[in-house]
Regions:
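Short loop/turn motifs that connect adjacent beta-strands in outer-membrane beta-barrel proteins
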Residues: 2-4, 25-35, 52-63, 114-122, ...
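Surface-exposed loop and membrane-interface regions of Gram-negative outer-membrane beta-barrel proteins
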Residues: 99-104, 116-149, 163-176, 305-306
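Signature for the C-terminal beta-barrel architecture of outer-membrane proteins
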Residues: 119, 162, 182-353, 363-375, ...
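Extracellular/periplasm-exposed beta-strand and loop segments of Gram-negative cell-envelope proteins
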Residues: 99, 111, 189, 356-361
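N-terminal periplasmic/intermembrane-space "pro-region" immediately following the signal or transit peptide
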Residues: 1-98
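Outer-membrane beta-barrel translocator/receptor signature
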Residues: 92, 102-108
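Outer-membrane beta-barrel "beta-signal"
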Residues: 410, 419-421, 431-443
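Structural signature for solvent-exposed beta-strand/loop edge elements and short helix-capping sites
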Residues: 1, 9-29, 40, 160-182, ...
């Protein structure tokens, strides 16, 4: 089972394709799944050949391109949180910090990646957009170089990351905010505890990263106690006692400076001496026959070196509503308390470039999420999702939100994918309506 850390590398995905093909030798796949597996094999042909010892990975090239057109009719462009300097938008979550403009939106992306040698991989994904509010804009979703030193992978640059479990959102660190430029270390392969006292742990993977936040945090917060270019560091260990069970331990810290008190977890009671904001906790995923169960329990603060002011999410994924697996279902619930994502010294809160680094749900909130998907034999997919949330529950206004979205995707030809969506969202008396259509090419 993959660790609960994204993104996955192309080599990782190639290994999983080979594993799936080995399983399919004794247990034939249903048509819809075979179509998807064949498409992945074709897209990862060079990596698969390399793993089989029949080729080299010197393949930096254009991997894909996409054009997305959407029309958004909204009563409000964005909504603010009570205790964090950030905003969010109806029908637009976990989108790497990007907001839609009111009315017509056009977005184009190019994805270029590959390996310069067996020791160096690179990737770049520029994004070009236009809407009537911001007019034309160009940005970089990702741009990175990756190498290795012994058993460690080393990545430098910008790359969207998400840690933890949950489809609707991750509590500490997800894809809701703009990707950061960071240095990341990870084990290239999980460490196996073959013998000894720790054999019961099975396998373990480690991810570590460090980045800097934006340089205008003092001015935007209006507080001299804030820190421009504060550090953001994260450590995550995924332990896999069995192939069906993964447990993750995670600590994320927003730091004014490094010192022994942070290492030991000794919080200061004086605002002048409080130099960090932590989110830490654990999550797990267990795969039973016919259902996967996952949950998180994280603390936004600490008491005696242990997390407190807790939040949680819990979910169940049913991969086979019918015997061939062409229908699946996911249901989730999440809850945060009123301390989440805010801080008494770092006034901007748990944010980066006006978006929460964790779950868009925010503080003092709860959410129920459900989605059902039907996978078609030609590789297409039909999906329906529903979100109900009560945001900022103790605020004076009514924060109840409902969103429903219907999506459909279909392969028009070998390397061309059509994807469409319609959505409706409501918050108090405000509504938002979305119609989107896009084309993606894979090369």
């Amino acid at each position: 089972m993959p660790a609960n850390t994204k993104p996955y590398s192309r080599l990782d995905m190639a290994k999983w394709v080979l594993q799936a093909e080995a399983i399919a030798q004794s247990k034939p796949l249903p048509p819809y799944l075979q179509t998807r597996l064949d498409a992945m094999r074709e897209g990862l042909a060079e990596e698969i050949a390399y793993l089989q010892g029949a080729g080299k990975i010197n393949n930096v090239k254009l991997r894909g391109a996409s054009v997305d057109l959407s029309y958004l009719q909204q009563d409000s462009a964005a909504y603010k949180y009570n205790n964090a300097k950030a905003h969010w938008q109806l029908l637009n979550h976990n989108n790497n910090g990007y907001l839609y403009g009111d009315g017509f939106n056009a977005v184009g992306t190019l994805h270029i990646s590959g390996s310069l040698s067996k020791d160096l991989a690179v990737g770049i994904t520029p994004r070009f957009s236009w809407d009537k509010d911001e007019h034309g804009d160009a940005s970089l979703i990702e741009g990175y170089a990756k190498t290795h030193l012994g058993v460690w992978g080393i990545t430098a640059g910008r790359q969207p990351m998400s840690w933890g479990v949950g489809r609707a959102g991750q509590l500490a660190f997800g894809s809701n905010a703009t990707p950061q430029t960071a240095i990341k270390l990870n084990l290239l392969e999980p460490h196996t505890f073959d013998n000894g006292a720790l054999k019961f742990l099975g396998k373990a993977n480690v991810n570590v990263f460090a980045s800097r936040l934006e340089g205008n945090r003092v001015a935007s917060s209006g507080s001299a106690l804030e820190k421009d270019h504060a550090a953001l560091v994260g450590v995550r260990v995924d332990i896999m006692p069995t192939d069906a069970f993964t447990i993750g331990l995670e600590r994320m810290s927003m730091l004014k400076k490094f010192n022994k008190h942070w290492l030991l977890g000794d919080n200061a009671d004086d605002a002048e001496k409080d130099n960090w904001n932590d989110i830490a906790g654990l999550d797990f995923k267990y795969r039973f026959p016919g259902v996967q169960v996952y949950a998180s329990l994280y603390g936004e603060d600490q008491a005696h070196a242990f997390p407190c002011e807790n939040a949680y999410n819990v979910g169940m994924y049913f991969p086979q509503l019918v015997p061939d697996g062409s229908w699946d279902l996911r249901v989730e619930a999440a809850k945060t308390n009123d301390a989440w994502y805010g801080h008494w010294v770092l006034k901007n809160g748990w944010t980066y470039k006006d978006a929460i680094l964790g779950d868009w749900l925010g503080a003092d909130a709860k959410r129920v999420y459900a989605e059902v998907n039907h996978y078609l034999a030609d590789g297409g997919k039909l999906g329906l999702s529903y979100t109900w949330a009560d945001m900022q529950q103790t605020a004076q206004h009514d924060g109840r939100l409902q969103e429903v979205e219907l999506s459909y995707s279909k392969s028009l030809q070998k390397d061309l994918l059509l994807h469409t969506a319609v959505g409706y969202g409501k918050l108090r008396d405000d509504t938002s309506k979305l119609v989107a259509v896009g084309l993606s090419w894979e090369y």
